[in-house]
């Protein structure tokens, strides 16, 4: 590595550390650590063993963030000092490069910790695709998104499973529900929630005109046993139907598909992936609990927005990302302004750049 490259790398590292410091709010972090430490010195702290363990775990996590930041700061300062001494002693160059590599590794892991630090980021994810109005063209767009997310999941080590599939009238899909099982599935895929817009020459239009289509993507964390969402049996209507795979393959001769309707909210979920009615009901119930939990979180967020006077409409005009196939090729995220011209690669599941840009934008916003 040339000296000029080393200098540039040190400048970039200092900028990253400044960003980390701003995101962490070190003064607040120190106060939280002191508060929890004081709680743990109380004589009756261990009377409630479960609460005590939770507090202890929270303290360890906060201390871990705090200590790692200061370790990075010390390593950065040491790297700067070695650079100053390099003019007098060339033999320090190897040690300097090793320090930079070590700092890069720590910073990368630390950045991911900060980016995926919200509740349920580490949970599995449930993702739904719903094409908008536009008939076959819109339903085909939904199918292209299904392919994109399936390829993304497979390429990134997630177990991807189709929970429910409703085929389109001529092509594509009317709706699909997927599960992504693996570390940080929800934390990564939450960036995809919103309206996705397609512009292309429709293969279903004999006049070869340009069409604009929309599809909405919903993403929810799969809830584990530590999160309780009460669903009363009296509030649920269950219907059964014959289920089949994508495109109508393997259609069952018995009604194993399950559709649950939550009467108070009107939320409808269905599962067709399991071979048994019991299995599909269990999966559908988990999906319903996730939707009810998300609904409650959205209500809380709306209350906060109302207090702030922040009104944000969710409409087809508020798309989060546009995919332009013609007259030029471009995929652009309208929240982060991150864009790529290689639309084919994006549709093959290479959306990591959009996800990274979104997570960093969330921290800076």
Curated annotation (Swiss-Prot):
Where are residues bearing N5-methylglutamine located in the sequence? 249
Q: In which compartments does the protein localize?
A: Cytoplasm
- Keywords of this entry: Cytoplasm, Methylation, Protein biosynthesis
Its main localization is: cytoplasm
A molecular-function term among this protein's GO annotations? translation release factor activity, codon specific
Pfam families referenced in this protein's UniProt entry, alphabetically:
PCRF, RF-1
Q: Name one GO cellular component term.
A: cytoplasm
Q: How is it modified after translation?
A: Methylated by PrmC. Methylation increases the termination efficiency of RF2.
Query: In the UniProt record, does the keyword Zinc occur?
Result: no
Record-linked InterPro entries? PCRF, Pep_chain_release_fac_I, Pep_chain_release_fac_I_sf, PrfB
The entry assigns this protein to a family as follows:
Belongs to the prokaryotic/mitochondrial release factor family.
Cross-referenced PANTHER family: CLASS I PEPTIDE CHAIN RELEASE FACTOR (PTHR43116:SF3), PEPTIDE CHAIN RELEASE FACTOR 2 (PTHR43116)
Q: Which purpose does this protein serve, as stated in its record? A: Peptide chain release factor 2 directs the termination of translation in response to the peptide chain termination codons UGA and UAA.
Q: What is this protein called?
A: Peptide chain release factor 2
Q: Which organism is it from?
A: Streptococcus agalactiae serotype Ia (strain ATCC 27591 / A909 / CDC SS700)
At the highest ranks, the source species' classification is: Bacteria, Bacillati, Bacillota, Bacilli, Lactobacillales
């Amino acid at each position: 590595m040339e000296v000029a490259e080393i200098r540039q790398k040190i400048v970039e590292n200092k900028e990253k550390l400044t960003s980390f410091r701003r995101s962490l709010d070190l003064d607040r972090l120190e106060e939280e650590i002191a508060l929890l430490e004081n709680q743990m010195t109380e004589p009756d702290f261990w009377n409630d063993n479960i609460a005590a363990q939770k507090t202890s775990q929270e303290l360890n996590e906060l201390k871990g963030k705090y200590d790692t930041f200061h370790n990075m700061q010390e390593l950065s300062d040491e790297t700067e000092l070695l650079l100053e001494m390099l003019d007098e002693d060339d033999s320090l160059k190897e040690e300097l490069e090793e320090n930079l590599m070590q700092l890069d590794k720590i910073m990368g892991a630390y950045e991911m910790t900060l980016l995926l630090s919200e509740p349920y980021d580490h949970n599995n994810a449930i993702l739904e695709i719903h094409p908008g109005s536009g008939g076959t063209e819109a339903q085909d767009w939904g199918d292209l998104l299904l392919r994109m997310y399936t390829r993304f999941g497979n390429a990134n080590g997630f177990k991807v499973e189709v929970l429910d599939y409703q085929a389109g009238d001529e092509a594509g899909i009317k709706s699909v529900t997927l599960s992504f099982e693996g570390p940080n599935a929800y934390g990564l895929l939450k960036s995809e929630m919103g309206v996705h817009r397609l512009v292309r020459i429709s293969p279903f239009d004999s006049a070869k005109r340009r069409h604009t289509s929309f599809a909405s993507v919903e993403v929810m964390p799969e809830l584990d046993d530590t999160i309780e969402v009460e669903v009363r049996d009296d509030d649920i209507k269950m219907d059964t139907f014959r289920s089949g795979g994508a495109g109508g393959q393997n259609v069952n001769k018995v009604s194993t598909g399950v559709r649950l309707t939550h009467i108070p909210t009107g939320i409808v979920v269905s599962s067709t992936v399991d071979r048994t009615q019991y299995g599909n009901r269990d999966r559908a119930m988990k999906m319903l609990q996730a939707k009810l939990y998300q609904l409650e979180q959205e209500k809380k967020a709306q209350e906060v927005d109302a207090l702030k006077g922040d009104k944000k409409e969710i409409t087809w005009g508020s798309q989060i990302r546009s995919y332009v196939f013609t007259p030029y090729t471009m995929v652009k995220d309208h929240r982060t302004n991150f864009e790529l011209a290689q639309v084919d690669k994006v549709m093959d599941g290479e959306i990591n750049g959009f996800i990274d840009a979104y997570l960093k934008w969330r921290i800076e916003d």
